């Protein structure tokens, strides 16, 4: 549930305001003044809550909704109780997220963990670092020589920013995160415990065992990227590791040296991307995906969760399985194996 102790709504919105803000169509203009000050799942709802229904899986909830208003596609609009204001939108969840950011702005973007409004007296900042006015540096932060931090950026307690790193404006670095050898754009969110710019896993076989290869590249993180808690992004060996604009990376993701990820990609938790992989724009990776080194994943590809990739994926294709292959082929193989297993079992039972 949404606890107002943690997340108080910014203000009340009317159904008419929500329609205008999201580009939705309010079915009954007589419900323009319906008040909305909470968000809830359709299965729970609430007296002043906005909910959304976006597929046949949860459309069965429509007749029994308990909510102030619902965002839904046109085909479900006539199934809602008359007491619920219906807002028609082709992408209800997207509209719902927009309203959520307006109702609960502090939940949409991380902020200071303390009441600090400037630079804490308990932070260590090298005299050669440049912190723009309006940045917030909380207690326990360590900022090295030559660092630049833009206005509006929050550096949470005990984060460490290494020598000469640049962090743009209106960003966030979470508690205990560490950043080194990195150039970071504007509005970048790096959650607590993340590690950016450490050595890539570079070793070469030697007479006495593995020998370290110096990693002398950087990490470049473009604008509007988000990196989840305890994820790691290794710096390049000689070229850069690059995370493209708008890409969102979940918790516990490993990105190795020299990887290049395009724009607006989604990488779900527990995924691992090996060295020198190139990922195009608008790629989606499910949880636990593993990519072998030096692969190319084409723009718009979708990679199924828990899949292992040892070959390139063409643009726009859906792949999955282990080893991964086009999803239709993977499903056919699974169906064939099941058929063969059943036939074998029946043969044993009859014989």
Curated annotation (Swiss-Prot):
Reactions accelerated catalytically: a UDP-3-O-[(3R)-3-hydroxyacyl]-alpha-D-glucosamine + a (3R)-hydroxyacyl-[ACP] = a UDP-2-N,3-O-bis[(3R)-3-hydroxyacyl]-alpha-D-glucosamine + holo-[ACP] + H(+)
Annotated InterPro entries: Hexapep (IPR001451), LpxD (IPR007691), Trimer_LpxA-like_sf (IPR011004), UDP_GlcNAc_AcTrfase_non-rep (IPR020573)
E.C. numbers: 2.3.1.191
Pfam families: Hexapep, LpxD
Pathway: Bacterial outer membrane biogenesis; LPS lipid A biosynthesis
Active site, UniProt feature: 257 (proton acceptor)
BP terms from Gene Ontology: lipid A biosynthetic process
Keywords for this protein: Acyltransferase, Lipid A biosynthesis, Lipid biosynthesis, Lipid metabolism, Repeat, Transferase
UniProt key word Acyltransferase: yes
Subunit field text: Homotrimer.
Name of this chain's protein: UDP-3-O-acylglucosamine N-acyltransferase
Gene: lpxD
């Amino acid at each position: 549930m949404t606890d107002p102790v943690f997340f108080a709504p910014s203000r009340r919105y009317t159904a008419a305001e929500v329609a205008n803000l999201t580009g939705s169509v309010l079915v009954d203009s007589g419900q323009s003044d319906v008040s909305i000050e909470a968000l809830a799942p359709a299965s729970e709802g609430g007296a002043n809550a906005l909910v959304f229904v976006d597929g046949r899986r949860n459309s069965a909830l429509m007749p029994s909704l308990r909510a102030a208003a619902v965002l839904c596609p046109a085909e479900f609009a006539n199934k809602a109780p008359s007491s619920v204001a219906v807002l028609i939108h082709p992408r209800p969840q997207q509209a719902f997220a927009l309203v959520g950011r307006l109702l609960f702005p502090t939940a949409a973007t991380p902020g200071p963990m303390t009441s600090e409004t400037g630079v804490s007296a308990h932070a260590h900042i090298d005299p050669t670092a440049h912190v723009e006015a309006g940045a917030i540096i909380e207690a326990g932060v360590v900022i090295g020589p030559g660092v630049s931090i833009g206005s509006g950026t929050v550096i949470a307690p005990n984060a460490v920013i290494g020598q000469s790193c640049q962090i743009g404006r209106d960003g966030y670095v979470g508690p205990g995160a560490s950043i080194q050898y990195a150039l970071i754009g504007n509005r970048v969110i790096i959650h607590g415990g993340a590690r950016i710019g450490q050595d890539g896993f570079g070793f070469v076989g030697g007479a006495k065992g593995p020998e370290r290869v110096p990693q002398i590249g950087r990490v470049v993180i473009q604008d509007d990227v988000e990196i989840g808690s305890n994820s790691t992004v290794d710096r390049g060996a000689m070229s850069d590791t690059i995370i493209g604009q708008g890409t969102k990376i979940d918790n516990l993701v490993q990105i190795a040296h020299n990887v290049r990820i395009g724009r607006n990609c989604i990488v779900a938790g527990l995924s691992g991307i090996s060295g020198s992989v190139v990922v195009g724009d608008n790629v989606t990776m499910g949880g636990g995906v593993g990519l072998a080194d030096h692969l190319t994943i084409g723009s718009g590809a979708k990679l199924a969760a828990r899949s292992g990739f040892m070959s390139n994926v063409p643009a726009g294709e859906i792949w999955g399985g282990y080893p991964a292959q086009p999803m239709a082929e993977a499903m056919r193989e699974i169906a064939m194996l099941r058929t063969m297993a059943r036939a074998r079992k029946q043969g044993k039972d009859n014989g």
